[in-house]
Amino acid sequence: MQLYPAIDMKDGKCVRLTKGLFDNITVYSDTPADMAKLWVSQGATFLHLVDLDGALAGHSVNAPAIREVLSLVSVPVQLGGGIRSAEDVKAMLDLGISRCIIGTKAAERPEFMRELVEAFGPERIVAGVDAKDGMAAVAGWEKTSSMTALELCMKMKEYGVRHIVYTDISRDGTLTGPNIPYTRMLAEKTGLNVIASGGVSSMEDLETLSENRIPGVIIGKALYEKRISLPDAVARFQ
């Protein structure tokens, strides 16, 4: 199971939100690059970066912080937040990002994902499927679409997407445990590389995800609140 330590950026700082609410923010570090170095030194082999300002603005906002992270670590980095066009994807890949996560645009115009996969290849493009009560959410989680998360995932598969980051918004940043039944259902029904996100709080959660053969998991607040030791998690599950 691939572990992805999360680094969420807002105003150039490393932060965590609770349930995706922008008025519920905790700042963990003034320098995202320092967090990236720390996680890599503790065994991280892939990092998950989120440009929260970008998610709201609809374009990349934290490029200097992203550039600094990439200059200091040698492991692959996936990035989400504010990537809404092929030009955005190209700019981020040119910076050195390994995989771009497309969220809002994937739900609003799924066929756009086919264009991206054809242009950049399936290993470079990830669909960010964010769900609220089973419905796909868009625009920095401020709105829900008319599609279920499963319908969106099946559409993504049809268009050549191989990687999905599935986030249960109601659990994100809450440390209440991930939505394992739904995540497992998505992985089994789609056959895609489903990366679980939202609510992971303990080694027990990782154990359950691993037992359910979930291919990957993003760990955020649990690392920052020291509920999960990354070296221990890497040794046990990766």
Which residue stretches match the model-derived regions?
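Conserved, mostly hydrophobic/aromatic
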Residues: 8, 39, 47, 92, ...
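Conserved anion-binding
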Residues: 11-12, 18-23, 90-93, 97-172
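N-terminal beta-alpha supersecondary unit
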Residues: 14-60
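Short, acidic/polar
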Residues: 28-40, 84-90, 145-155, 206
